[in-house]
């Protein structure tokens, strides 16, 4: 039997939509089929749990970035402003999968004190932690009505595997194993709940068919690592003339798509409202490559308005070393080239035509369920920041 022990530390996590949140840190102990464990946990929940929405997200920690969904991709304002609670637990001694390498107690996985030279991993810890949360230990999270799971990239791959393993049976109502580059060979046959997978063009692998409890999506032109302060800090060199691909950064940010799909999944579970149908990139007749338009952009999939109106060629992966380990990480960044200007022969004749088309593309995404209202308005606002520039050119000029 596993136990979420009394928190060793707690602190304010801020106030969101007039609801105060508290972050708890402590030790989770027990035994799986691999042996005993004692690992760090972290829970962020309303100070008065009953005032939240009683839906809790268990995040599998990422090997490099730890709690990537809560901190970077969805964000605290998005989650906690809507009343969700969040929790994570260490399950491996490799990198930040441990969640906290110095929690103030001995970390044990698979019956062994963790040693970086002898990595230990036990994914069963994640599902035991989720099940223990339903018991509302120490009244930290309230009476949970729905339990979700989420992971991105490295942690999305781990969650993919968890969802196919017997120990996860009937654990989660909804899961988001995302941008994991696994493709059809690892397509989960989940033992519990509904599944939503978003993959970027870089991560996209052909899939066959669909199922009532799964939805699969792919973002055209999207790199594995979306635009962020992290990517901009790595790629600071000025563009040259003629303009090469602006390697490492891209205005095709997929974070808004993921937020819309998260809300769609939540409504799927709580209201029975179907999410958008599976939407994938189009393949060549041979089925072994992505179809592209004359500009070189991928066809099909979820299409950012800048890509849909043809502002540039958007590249899902660029061949560029970056000054951080490990070396292969460069493949995870995107870029863009062949940027078009208003008045170009193969583009819009005037600014009014351009803005009208961009706005229509953003509204179409919103109607399809791939953009929230606030993100639709934000995209159109960014396209209008300069009366002679496109969304891509405004991005390139650093206006947003």
Predicted regions mapped to residue ranges:
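Catalytic-loop region of hydrolases
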Residues: 1-74, 135, 348-375, 379-400
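Long, well-ordered hydrophobic secondary-structure segments characteristic of membrane-embedded
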Residues: 7, 11-67, 125-133, 145, ...
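Active-site machinery of serine-nucleophile hydrolases
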Residues: 13, 21-29, 53-130, 213-232
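Surface-exposed acidic, glycine-flexible loop patches that form ligand/cofactor-binding
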Residues: 44-52, 75-78, 133-147, 166-169, ...
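Loop/turn elements at helix/coil->beta-strand transitions in domains of secreted/extracellular proteins
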Residues: 51-56, 82-87, 143-147, 170-174, ...
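Primarily recognizes the serine-hydrolase "nucleophile elbow" in alpha/beta-hydrolase
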Residues: 64, 139, 143-187
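Alpha/beta-hydrolase active-site loop
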Residues: 108-140, 149, 166-167, 254-257
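C-terminal subdomain of alpha/beta-hydrolase-fold enzymes, centered on the catalytic histidine
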Residues: 185-386, 395-400
